[in-house]
Amino acid sequence: VRQHFARFLVEERNYPVSLMMTEYSLMLNNMSRRCDIIMFERSGAARALVECKAPTVKINQAVFDQVARYNLVFRVEYLFVTNGLQHYCCKIDFETGEIIFLPDIPTYDSLLTS
């Protein structure tokens, strides 16, 4: 699922492969974790996190909680969750605390300009 979604981001949404890292290590509560995909800006700032699950795994609150915990480290505006069959994207407004679910996965350019 991770490879397919990464290819989708590159081929369909114009994400630069050079700014995408898979299985990116992070420390959370003194424990080593890995996010599936992290997208960066050219400046090196993290911009989006992707959590991938197997097609047999239902996307539920626990999956969103997992990627939200990872985001405590990165504080990116965009979180993507996919099981290869369903894709979700939410945008976080850190000033208001509002979480907005988007109807589609944004292009890389729109990710940077919003």
Could you describe each region identified by the protein language model?
Residues V1-Y78, L85-S114:
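A short, conserved, highly charged catalytic patch centered on acidic carboxylates
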